[in-house]
């Protein structure tokens, strides 16, 4: 029997509640006749670790993750620690250290969930947003000088490389090719950013020639936000820079009903390193410890993890269980207008996996 070694990093806030819920659901799936099992290793990194050690994770923290088949992550963020420390000290350290250059965020309106767009049906909103996850606006290049003085200066430099853009474009075109509509929208801002984004556009055109069966178009990022709201059915697969996709994918999750249901995968397509899967919601300290967190985003992230591991049948089974639960409005958590608890939603998914 195959054993998948999964690193679990709950992180901060409600991450400490939804990651154990994800483990419980994966164990229930494995126990329900699957031909594999899971071996979980938990890492207590995050804000509490920072308070004890002055860093979000150990300096050599990537090493115990390196031999794992995948990483299940919760959330990063602590109201008592600057955001740039919590993000760069943990999540981005893993993403960049393992060259997880493709961030993939599927968005659908799940059964039983009401999206805010009154003329948008579930069939109209079925997207995947591909985010360049290794460079661009989050390359980490920049600095500050003359801090505290009137002439203080600070820079954050967006860095794009030909190799980095080529590989994310090729990944996005290949993903679009695998979907029924074979449709890709390349998000840009080359009208105002006339160097790196122009190169981005040129490389998109170049890579498109490798995929003659994929229909593609180009959309300015500001216009894309309006298109997502006004013409959602015109979109299918999107590819955007690190910052642009970060913003667009949160809008996408909101249009699908809640950030609490949205998953993401930080993927190393070449499989040199473990990929990392996580819900996109934040640490939500306001509801931490109250049992109110929506675990659906974590469960859907587990579906993505199973697909990445090649367990497509098990992934489909878990997704059916998730959709059966969201279809029952008595099992909606507060972010969806209900009063169900994390435990109730988790137990309901586990019951459906066992039945």
Regions found by a protein language model. Name each.
Residues 12-15, 69, 130, 172, ...:
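Buried hydrophobic positions in well-ordered alpha/beta secondary-structure cores of metabolic enzymes
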Residues 22, 26, 204, 298-306, ...:
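Buried hydrophobic packing segments
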Residues 47-49, 104, 227-330:
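Glycine-rich phosphate/nucleotide-binding loop
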Residues 112, 219-226:
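Short acidic loop-to-helix transition motifs that present clustered carboxylates
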Residues 140-186, 190-194, 312, 317, ...:
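Glycine-rich phosphate/pyrophosphate-binding loop and the adjoining helix
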